[in-house]
């Protein structure tokens, strides 16, 4: 995986997968106030519309995480890989049909919790 010989054999504590997700696949999200909003597929720009994409990272369900975090001593620690979220700007519509830019939560990493 790595071209640097010093880094060969390095593994993450938790396995993750990352992918581009379209607003068509996302449909809804939670905004900063905790409200569920509709994620709009297209964003209006001066020359038409652009599709909305989000780069999401989450824990890999097929990875090592079933037995806890890699490298954590199971006899002494109860560990778990968990997907965490961050806020990103998205073009959305709220329950009152108000359209605009809001911060929504998306999956952004896989971390080890003890």
Swiss-Prot record:
Any GO CC annotation of this UniProt entry: dendrite
Location within or outside the cell: Secreted
GO terms (BP aspect): cell surface receptor protein tyrosine kinase signaling pathway; modulation of chemical synaptic transmission; negative regulation of neuron apoptotic process; nerve development; nerve growth factor signaling pathway; neuron projection morphogenesis
Intrachain S-S bonds: 14-81, 59-110, 69-112
A Pfam family per the record: NGF
Keywords assigned: Disulfide bond, Growth factor, Secreted
Primary localization: secreted
InterPro entries given in the database record: Brain-der_neurotrophic_factor (IPR020430), Cystine-knot_cytokine (IPR029034), Nerve_growth_factor-like (IPR020408), Nerve_growth_factor-rel (IPR002072), Nerve_growth_factor_CS (IPR019846)
Keyword check for Disulfide bond: yes
Domain of life per record: Eukaryota
A GO molecular-function descriptor: growth factor activity
Record function comment: Promotes the survival of neuronal populations that are all located either in the central nervous system or directly connected to it.
PANTHER family xrefs: BRAIN-DERIVED NEUROTROPHIC FACTOR (PTHR11589:SF3), NERVE GROWTH FACTOR NGF -RELATED (PTHR11589)
Family: Belongs to the NGF-beta family.
Protein name (record): Neurotrophic factor BDNF precursor form
Lineage per the UniProt record: Eukaryota, Metazoa, Chordata, Craniata, Vertebrata
């Amino acid at each position: 995986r790595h071209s640097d010989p010093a880094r060969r054999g390095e593994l993450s504590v938790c396995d993750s997968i990352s992918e581009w997700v379209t607003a068509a696949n996302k449909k809804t999200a939670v905004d900063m106030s905790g409200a569920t909003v509709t994620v709009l597929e297209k964003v209006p720009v001066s020359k038409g519309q652009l599709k909305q994409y989000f780069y999401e990272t989450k824990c890999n369900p097929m990875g090592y995480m079933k037995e806890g975090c890699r490298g954590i001593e199971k006899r002494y620690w109860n560990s778990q890989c968990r997907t965490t979220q961050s806020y990103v700007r998205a073009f959305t519509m709220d329950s009152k049909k108000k359209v605009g830019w809001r911060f929504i939560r998306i999956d952004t990493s896989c971390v080890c919790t003890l």
